[in-house]
């Protein structure tokens, strides 16, 4: 069963099954670990930043409906909070242009702190911005 984007929380586990539409994609960059790019994705409940690696950068475009299995929502290099396939996950194109979506809230813009009662869990501690600061909404 798919989880809505509004319900994902940071974790160091590959356990997210979801689907979304890619709204926008940044130009790929090349680092020591290979090619990567960020994308803005959304479903009917929220938006999120997606990290695409290697061939994923070329495989997906704005308007694509994507299914993510065994995804992970975590900080990349202790800075950006992104949803990604990781080493054990998989992204697959399901179709194009046939899904309702919202651009707010953007769950990548939520501030999260470790739960004092359980260090494996995170709790919300505020919102940096309701919209993506990387992919600002059109006026």
Where do the protein language model's features map onto the residues?
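A short beta-strand motif that forms part of the nucleic acid-binding face
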Residues: 43-45, 54-56, 72, 85-87
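Short nucleic-acid-contacting surface segments enriched for D/E, G, S/T with interspersed K/R
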Residues: 54-70
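Short acidic/polar mixed-charge low-complexity motifs
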Residues: 46-48, 64, 79
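OB-fold (S1/OB) nucleic-acid-binding surfaces
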Residues: 21-50
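OB-fold nucleic-acid-binding modules
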Residues: 1-30, 56, 77-139
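Hydrophobic residues positioned within well-ordered beta-strands of beta-sheet architectures
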Residues: 18, 39, 68-69
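Short, charged beta-turn/beta-strand-edge "cap" motif at the junction between a beta-strand
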Residues: 71-77
């Amino acid at each position: 069963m798919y989880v809505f984007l509004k319900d994902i929380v940071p974790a160091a586990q590959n356990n997210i099954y979801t689907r979304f539409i890619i709204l926008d994609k940044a130009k790929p960059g090349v680092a020591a670990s290979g090619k990567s790019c960020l994308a803005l994705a959304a479903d009917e409940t929220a938006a999120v930043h997606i990290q695409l690696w290697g061939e994923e950068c070329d495989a997906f475009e704005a308007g694509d409906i994507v299914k993510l299995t065994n995804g992970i929502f975590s900080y990349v290099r202790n800075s950006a909070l992104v949803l990604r396939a990781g080493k054990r996950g998989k992204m697959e194109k399901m179709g194009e242009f046939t899904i309702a979506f919202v651009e707010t809230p953007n769950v990548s813009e939520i501030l999260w702190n470790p739960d004092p009662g359980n260090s494996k869990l995170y709790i919300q501690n505020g919102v940096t911005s309701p919209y993506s600061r990387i992919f600002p909404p059109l006026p």
